[in-house]
Amino acid sequence: MSDKKIKVPASPKIRKFAREFGININKIVGSERKGRVIESDVKNFITNQLNKDSSLNENKINNEFAHSDFGEIELKDIPRIKKLAAPYLVNSWTTIPHVTNHDEADITEMEDFRNSLTDIYTGEKKKISPLAFIVKALVASLKKFPNFNSSIDDIENGKITLKKYFHIGIAVDTPHGLMVPKIRNVNNKNINHISNELKKVSEQCKNLKINKKEFFGGSMTITSLGGIGGSFFTPIINYPEVAILGIARLEKKQISINNKFYLRTILPLSLSYDHRIIDGAEAARFNNDLKENLGKNFAYKLAV
């Protein structure tokens, strides 16, 4: 029997734990009766792999001089959240063949509508995040392109897991580091509900009062630089997801429509995807659909 068909005994919880680190659990020798794999076995396997990788780095170029040889320096501790995130980021970057598709969405009508929203009781302007509309638009596209809502759990046997749920990860910038909580079951929520949840999870992350489980079990992630600046970038996929959408600051641009120029509101899009399961043509079609969902017919598309 070939190695790839051997299945070691392990609980669903331990299998999930191994998958989160991108580890094939069948390569782990269990310490329990009949070779059953437990959590400590997975952790030991990770440690051994890291040690193995470092021992193979004989050709690594080392600094010939210390930084302090050239002037004053300061040593700082890496924040705990960043230390915890580091192996996940390295695993994503080294495991997934990333490709990034850059595009622009015309969201003029959507922004005009968002800025016109008022509370029916007080008459005050409603503060709805544009991200809430983007989350809703993304889910509409995920329904049409199910490969984007999947995970590759068994690449050796050619199997992918298609998810029937729609949990969108939102990258939150906090003083402690980047966190990615999930907005659950977005397909069943309206724009106002989503906007409120975005505020809620953001505060929970900043105050470190969020359950660890909320960082797992996502469909796809959105990362936004809108409040900071820039236009296009290359976001790293949040493993075990297969795609991530990066959005940047809105821009006002003169756009030619029917041979006339109009000032329009443009949203830069950066879509990174796993080239093992998604090809360039499918990514381009996905972006086109997303742009249409955010375009002038957004209210119809998103059931606003």
For the regions a protein language model found, what residue spans apply to each?
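Catalytic-site-adjacent helices and loops of nucleotide signaling machinery
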Residues: 30-31
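C-terminal catalytic/motor cores of large multi-domain enzyme assemblies
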Residues: 4, 13, 17-24, 36, ...
